[in-house]
Amino acid sequence: DISDIKDPEPDVQPTYTAAEAVQGLFAHKAVDVRMIPDYPSDRQFGAFYDAEGNCVYAKRGMGYEQIFTDVAVALAHAEMAKDIEGYLPAEHQFEARCAAYVLAKKYGVSTKAVEIDRVPEEYGVMDAAGIRENLARIHDSVKNISSGMYKALVKEKEQEVSPKEKSGKGGDAR
């Protein structure tokens, strides 16, 4: 199962709201993410990766869970495009959805929009090396996006801690 891909995690896994998860996703910054009001009506999803402009465009007005999953798919495309000459998102939609599924599961966002109900037919005729290559691509995308998200979210949580608590000089009157 693709959700078995895991990075080393802290002992206590923090929980995030969907809004915090979206904030972390946007902080990832492998590429710019631009929310646009005049989103193309011919697009199937609420976000897409533009390889020529090296940018993710997302539709304004979506809920946090849809923003997360749709932008996660687009960011996975951006990550994979770094290593593939002439990258075409349509050829890697399954891998990008898998990466978005893992990210959504990891950060507590609903996976309904990116659930995987079947494997593409080409995987049935692919040799083991090809499957491993695709799984490695998914893993690397998840790792890179998650790493950036985690850093941004930890930084955000640390900023919420008061300077008194941070320095350890709380109200201990010994």
Q: Where in the sequence are the language-model features?
A:
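Intrinsically disordered, low-complexity linkers and terminal tails enriched in Pro/Gly
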Residues: 1-8, 159-167
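Active-site metal-coordination segments of metallo-dependent hydrolases
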Residues: 84-95, 105
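An acidic intrinsically disordered interaction segment
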Residues: 60-71, 143
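Catalytic phosphate/metal-binding cores of nucleic-acid and nucleotide-processing enzymes, i.e., regions
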Residues: 39-40, 71, 135, 140
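Contiguous, non-catalytic segments that form substrate-binding/exosite surfaces or channel walls
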Residues: 1-62
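Active-site recognition of the HExxH zinc-binding catalytic motif
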Residues: 66-85, 96
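Long, well-structured alpha-helical subdomains associated
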Residues: 101-164, 174
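Hydrophobic (often cysteine-bearing) scaffold residues that line and stabilize catalytic clefts
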Residues: 18, 68, 92-95, 134, ...
